Amino acid sequence: MRRVAKLSAACAATAALALTATACGSTSSDNNASPSSSGGAKGGIKIGLAYDVGGRGDRSFNDSAARGSDKAAKEFGGSIKELTAKTSDTEADREQRLSDLAQAGYNPIVAVGFSYAPAVTKIAKQFPKTNFGIVDSVVNASNVDSITFTEEQGSYLAGVAAALKTKKDHVGFIGGVDVPLIKKFEAGYVQGVHDTNPKIKVDTQYLSHGSDFSGFASPDKGKAAAQGMLDNGADVIYSAAGSSGNGAIEAVSGTKGAWAIGVDSDQYNIPGLAKYKNSILTSMVKNVDVGVYDFIKSVHDGKPLAGLNAYSLAKNGVSLATSGGFINDIQPKLDAAKQKIVSGQIKVKTTP
């Protein structure tokens, strides 16, 4: 869940994304380091991964980034150094994190989340021979790969699914933090719902606002928000809220006939959510792992990607998960909606 914004050295980003950290293997450091996985022999590619709040283990966005780096390390040999942010981080903290990785010889370095955009803009200039990748923002520099996604398109399909599955003509959307990136998820979802059935009521709630990024890493807040919507009559709830969405899924699982829609990863198949999987209708999968892997591979191959690389619905950058078979009966309608988006017949909004 994140905003794409063109930034120059004078620009500033506004938010952080939720993530959580665990792994196997390992190197670590004092800069809020999480354990890091390693693959292959010493002397291989050295991958630096800078997570935002939470890091590896969020069962969502950051875990998807981790899968991409893990795959690359295993395939090409080498190691991964992972550093994770805190909710109290300043811009200087993010800059220091990237600088530490670059000074230690990690190349490429992946910054996970748009809050790193100003830091990448600055540090990439200081280390012109190091290749940087940033997820969910655009930084204009010759040594930066901007990895973006059309979240609104995938969320539109989630809205279609919600509209076709609700029994009460009442659904909900939970956003982690009230920032432009998450507004893309909301906009696509609401449009998908109303294009399918304009009579359906959509409840919307954001868990935090402004510079308070706790909404991306507070499962208790997600659970409370979802429970409020369920009590108010909603029976399908889509969350774009990092690990806070795990709490929403838990709440939905306690209500017979209600559905949760996951985000970023195929949450039906996440071990930590296994006991709730029969309440997960689908997930709006954002293939961050593909973008991260493609970037690392390009550096390994000596042809580093740079500039804007957008992963759209047409390129399978976003999609709806089919695990569990709960949307099999509506798949033809979802496929039809997808084709209309890909062909340009449907223009999906990026703001509510």
Per-segment meaning from a language model:
Residues 18-23:
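C-terminal motif of bacterial Sec signal peptides marking the signal peptidase cleavage site
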Residues 3-5, 26, 30-352:
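A residue-level marker of the well-folded mature domains of exported/periplasmic proteins
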Residues 1-12:
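Bacterial N-terminal signal peptides that target proteins for export
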Residues 13-17:
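Core hydrophobic alpha-helical transmembrane segments of single-pass membrane proteins
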